[in-house]
């Protein structure tokens, strides 16, 4: 009985036609592939990309040198040096470095920050030729924040109900 069923299936090419109709069903659908360098797919507001330090609207940097991001970083990729207290009692950072080679993009630094100073922005295209270029200092992080501020603020506003 098994050989009869096997010969009927092979006679009528059951597997071939099943595979053919399956491939035809997907052949006429819209393609899922995009031409990457020229087209970019949608990025989630929660995407964790290149790090950035944000500023207040008046231009002052947000980081208050509380060092919570440095303490919570599981990869120990963040190094902060706090400056002396100012006349108004606040502190600012003198040095803020992130070693992006060590970073695991977990987002803990962003969640720990009480003033939303350090964020992971929408940029995922920051490939470099040397490892030294992946050592971000304060100036580079502030430049990233200035460059991506509009998108970062929009993403934080979209994600705010879930924080």
Swiss-Prot record:
It is found in: Cell inner membrane. It catalyses: a quinone + NADH + 5 H(+)(in) = a quinol + NAD(+) + 4 H(+)(out). Residues 53-83, 94-123 form the 4Fe-4S ferredoxin-type domain. It comes from the Bacteria. PROSITE patterns: 4FE4S_FER_1, 4FE4S_FER_2. GO terms for biological process: aerobic respiration. [4Fe-4S] cluster 1 binds at residues 63, 66, 69, 113. Signal peptide: none annotated. InterPro entries: 4Fe4S_Fe-S-bd, 4Fe4S_Fe_S_CS, NADH_quinone_OxRdtase_chainI. It is a peripheral membrane protein. Its main location: membrane. It is an enzyme of class 7 (translocase). One of its GO terms (molecular function) is 4 iron, 4 sulfur cluster binding. [4Fe-4S] cluster 2 binds at residues 73, 103, 106, 109. Belongs to the complex I 23 kDa subunit family. NDH-1 shuttles electrons from NADH, via FMN and iron-sulfur (Fe-S) centers, to quinones in the respiratory chain. The immediate electron acceptor for the enzyme in this species is believed to be ubiquinone. Couples the redox reaction to proton translocation (for every two electrons transferred, four hydrogen ions are translocated across the cytoplasmic membrane), and thus conserves the redox energy in a proton gradient. This is NADH-quinone oxidoreductase subunit I 1. The lineage of its organism: Bacteria, Pseudomonadati, Pseudomonadota, Alphaproteobacteria, Hyphomicrobiales. The gene is nuoI1.
């Amino acid at each position: 009985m098994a050989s009869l069923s096997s010969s009927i299936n092979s006679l009528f090419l059951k597997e071939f036609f099943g595979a053919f109709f399956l491939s035809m069903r997907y052949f006429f659908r819209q393609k899922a592939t995009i031409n990457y360098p020229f087209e970019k797919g949608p990025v989630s507001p929660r995407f964790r990309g290149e790090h950035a330090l944000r500023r207040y609207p008046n231009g002052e940097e947000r980081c208050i040198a509380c060092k919570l991001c440095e303490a919570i970083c599981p990869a120990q990729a963040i190094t902060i040096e706090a400056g002396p207290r100012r006349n108004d009692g606040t502190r600012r950072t003198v040095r803020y470095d992130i070693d992006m080679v060590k970073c695991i993009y977990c987002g803990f630094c962003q969640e720990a920050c009480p003033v939303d100073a350090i964020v992971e922005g929408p940029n995922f295209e920051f490939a470099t030729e040397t490892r030294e270029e992946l050592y971000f200092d304060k100036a580079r992080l502030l430049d990233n924040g200035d460059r991506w501020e509009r998108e970062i603020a929009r993403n934080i506003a979209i994600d705010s109900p879930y924080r």
